[in-house]
């Protein structure tokens, strides 16, 4: 208020990456793993059920891209929640691939949605223009029913991306993480 400036962190990933870069940790370690827990803040008006201040627990792995590390992060987070007494967990996984795969999926999804466009709610028709993936998030029962057989984003992955995804699933099975595949 007034002439004062107050900075509150909206999330912690940027802080971790900044520290990693500013301290040249990337030159010292092949893989660096971080975890954090703390209060984060939203400036904009929060959506229903959300608060301006919230607690975030996060895990970051920097220095290497690996499906085994992806599975390890998921398994570690899963284990933490179980140890905190949170039971009946359901982990949902998928892969959005690269920009090329996302572009391919966007086209697949639009081809699927176009014949039913007039049956979709007004919000979904607008979403088709801006971000067709959002149509799959619609809460309107009729739209949910119309999109239940939409193509899976997994079908747009190239061979390397699909192998990465399959390896993540393999290691989640090894680590004993129960998961559901979302398309």
Residue ranges and their predicted role:
Residues 1-183:
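TRNA-recognition modules of translation machinery and tRNA-sensing kinases, especially anticodon-binding
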């Amino acid at each position: 208020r007034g002439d004062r400036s107050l900075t509150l962190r909206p999330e912690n990933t940027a802080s971790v990456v900044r520290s990693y870069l500013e301290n040249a940790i990337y030159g010292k370690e092949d893989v660096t793993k971080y975890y954090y827990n703390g209060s984060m803040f939203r400036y904009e008006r929060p959506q229903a059920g959300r608060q301006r201040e919230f607690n975030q627990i996060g895990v970051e792995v920097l220095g290497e891209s690996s499906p085994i590390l992806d599975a390890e992060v998921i398994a570690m987070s899963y284990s933490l929640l179980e140890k905190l007494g949170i039971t009946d967990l359901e982990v949902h996984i998928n892969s959005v691939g690269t920009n090329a795969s996302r572009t391919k999926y966007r086209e697949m999804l639009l081809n699927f949605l176009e014949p039913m466009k007039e049956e979709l709610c007004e919000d979904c028709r607008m979403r088709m223009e801006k971000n067709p993936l959002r149509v799959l998030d619609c809460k309107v029962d009729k739209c949910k029913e119309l999109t239940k057989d939409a193509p899976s984003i997994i079908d747009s992955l190239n061979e390397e991306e699909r192998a990465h995804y399959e390896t993540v699933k393999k290691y989640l099975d090894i680590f004993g993480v129960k998961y559901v595949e979302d398309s």
